[in-house]
Structures are given as structure tokens and as C-alpha cells.
């Protein structure tokens, strides 16, 4: 981005981590070309959000007649994310996955680490501001969503949109196993629009996560930021080639 200035289209070949690097570079240098995605990662969350296809060949073909659509993004201090920002249980699981052996046996190393996280009591007392309103309580996870998917799973709320000018906030206060099942295990049938004990949901333009300090935040699978955090939506910041969803 520092060297290339006059271009209209960027094709990103890779997963959400690669896309994260590209959009942060474009944001830093105030560039806004059209972006096309050819998925090549583990989960490919944002390629699903733009409905371009999970298969690289299929996605390449879909790009030929895709439409340009503007999408919001999450600004966390000075870094950008497209899909989500989270602390607590999901971030702890991401850290366990990062620690796991990346060899053939990596997945088998990761599974017991997941259950280790689920069975530990790692809840925390939080203080937050959501659009100026102060909230305090105890939680196992705070999850801020912009995209439609997280970790390959559809975010379980029916009216979420990455182009509506707001972020969706989930504060999970129930037991870890219950929260894990609700948010990631039953997303096709479980809808947080319904009243659910132990889970608070909000729509917000700005979130301040005040305490506790020092929690590692997972932003689109990247683990390089810690709390406290100032989070806000940047409306229609990026242009992606996308396909409409069938009604």
C-alpha cells in the first residue's frame, strides 16, 4: 500500500488473516479500492459473508459477475476487523488453538485444550460502556460481531448485517458449556433474537471495554491486542465484490 497508489481492484487470495492484513494496510493509507476474495483459509468467514463461495474455483468464477457492495468494519483503537472482536471464552480457545501443534496431530492436540478451557471457571468482572451507557457484571465472554460468520459458524441472530451501521454485542453470562453450545453449536436453530437467560444482546455504534485490563482480544482470529479497548463501527468503509443471497 505504501508503494502502490493508483489501483482500482485488489484480489486477495487467502483466509481471514490475510484479508485482515490487507484491509489494515488499506485503512492506514486511506485507500478504498474494490476488493475481491478467493478463499484459502481455514474458516473463510468474510468470503461467506460476501457470499462469494468457499471453494477457490467457484469463488473465482463468481467474481466475474459479482456486484460491488459497501461494508462496515470494526475499528478497535487503531486496528480494523471485518468479522468480530471478542474477549473471554472464544479468545481463550483461539489461544489454545495457536498453542496446539500445527503438525498432522495438531487437531488432536487442540481438542483437549478446548475442553480444558470449557471446564475452567475463567469468568471475569467487567465494566463497559455501550453507546455511553455503563454496564457492569460477570461474564465468560464478550463478543462484538460485524460479519455474518465466526469460526466458520453463522452468528446466531437473524437481523445482523455488515452494512447497517451498527455492531451486534453479546455478553455471555451463563455457564461456559451452555454458552459454547448456544453460540457455536446450534447456530442454525438458535436465535439470540429470542429471550435467552444469561446472554445480553445490544446494537451499538461505540463500545468501550474498560476492565479488566490485560485480556487478550481475538480480532478476526488475530491475537495481538489487549484490553482496555475502544471499539466503534466505521460505516461503509470497504467495497467488496459480493453475490446476493437467495431469498
Features from the language model and the residues they span:
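ATP/NTP phosphate-donor binding region
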Residues: 1-13, 20, 24-25, 58, ...
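Glycine-rich beta-strand-to-loop/alpha-helix junction loops that act as flexible
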Residues: 13-15, 40
Amino acid at each position: 500500500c505504501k508503494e502502490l497508489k493508483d489501483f482500482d481492484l485488489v484480489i486477495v487470495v487467502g483466509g481471514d488473516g490475510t484479508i485482515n492484513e490487507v484491509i489494515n494496510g488499506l485503512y492506514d493509507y486511506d485507500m478504498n479500492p474494490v476488493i475481491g476474495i478467493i478463499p484459502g483459509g481455514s474458516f473463510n468467514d468474510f468470503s461467506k459473508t460476501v457470499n462469494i463461495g468457499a471453494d477457490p474455483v467457484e469463488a473465482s468464477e463468481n467474481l466475474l459477475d459479482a456486484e460491488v457492495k459497501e461494508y462496515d468494519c470494526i475499528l478497535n483503537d487503531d486496528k480494523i476487523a471485518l468479522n468480530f472482536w471478542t474477549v473471554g471464552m472464544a479468545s481463550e480457545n483461539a489461544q489454545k488453538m495457536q498453542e496446539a501443534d500445527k503438525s498432522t496431530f495438531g487437531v488432536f492436540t487442540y481438542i483437549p485444550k478446548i475442553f480444558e478451557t470449557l471446564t475452567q471457571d475463567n469468568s471475569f468482572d467487567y465494566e463497559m460502556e455501550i453507546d455511553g451507557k455503563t454496564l457492569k457484571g460477570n461474564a465468560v465472554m464478550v463478543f462484538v460481531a460485524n460479519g455474518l460468520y465466526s469460526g466458520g459458524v453463522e452468528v446466531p441472530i437473524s437481523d445482523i448485517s455488515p452494512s447497517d451501521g451498527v455492531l451486534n454485542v453479546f455478553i455471555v453470562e451463563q455457564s461456559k458449556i451452555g454458552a459454547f453450545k448456544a453460540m457455536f453449536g446450534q447456530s442454525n436453530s438458535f436465535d439470540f433474537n429470542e429471550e435467552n437467560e444469561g446472554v445480553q444482546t445490544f446494537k451499538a455504534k461505540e463500545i468501550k471495554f474498560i476492565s479488566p485490563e490485560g485480556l487478550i482480544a481475538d480480532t478476526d482470529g488475530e491475537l495481538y491486542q489487549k484490553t482496555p479497548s475502544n471499539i466503534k463501527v466505521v460505516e461503509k468503509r470497504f467495497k467488496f465484490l459480493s453475490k446476493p443471497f437467495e431469498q
